[in-house]
Amino acid sequence: EKSTTVYSPIVNRALITVARHLQRPALLESVRRNLEMTIFYVHPDGEVVTEASRRQDRYQRGSMARYYYSYRTLALIDGNGRFAALCRQIERTGRAQIGELAAFLTEPALLRALPADAPLPTDYAKHFSYSTLARIRRGSASATILANNTTLFSFRKNSAALEAVRFATAFFGKGQFTADTLEVRAGSYILRQSLEGPYFQPLSAAQIALGDHTKMAPNGTLATNSKAMRQQSNVQRLEASVEVTEFSGKFTLAISLTGTADVPVSIELAFRHGGKLTGVEPVSRVPDA
């Protein structure tokens, strides 16, 4: 489950509950693996990456508060110092959102003292191939690289938040860059997208004579897609790639396009509201741009 602030913690809690009531401790292994992975989704300020979600929390700011129950439970069961450290971090950064009073009343074992902290990772580069996502953390710098997502890159540094880098081309109405693949190669992260844009020719006389294009479905609509029946010509192709390289917490994005010439391109840098940009020119008649 890719929803980091809603459904992932719900699934963890459900598995823990079933494991306890049905005496099936093997179910906890999936919870452990999820909690270990989620450690690498946490920004320095305690917020969690939501860009990869397919649910309502996508691109929303969220804390780790809903994970508190799961991390505390497994920290106590396993004596896991990293899980205990993350519990204490949640207590510092997301205390107002923790809603675990009922759990402490029904499960007195949660009242036991947590194990001693073990260091949480603050310097890493992790590629999660199933999620087509890479996470890089260098101290106070935190970056996310994503395929299958209109946000291809996001970055945090202290209180500054570049919440999304996106780019699009004016290519047959389908030019919003959403990478098909994420390739990790020699310290670089390469996102790729391949597009085709055909021109559709009129139906042939034989196709019209058969009348297939005018057959109606029971609901009164055309039963066939006439565009799919039309011959294509002058098929245009556009290959787009973004290579992200990192050195000591500094990132370079190289965007390249090959194929159809003279295609307009727009690149968007979406910063979190509230900061102040310098060295830029405002876009006339466009708010916050």
Please give the residue ranges for each predicted region:
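Aromatic-lined, polymer-binding surfaces characteristic
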Residues: 1-28
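Extended polysaccharide-engagement surfaces of secreted carbohydrate-active enzymes
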Residues: 25-289
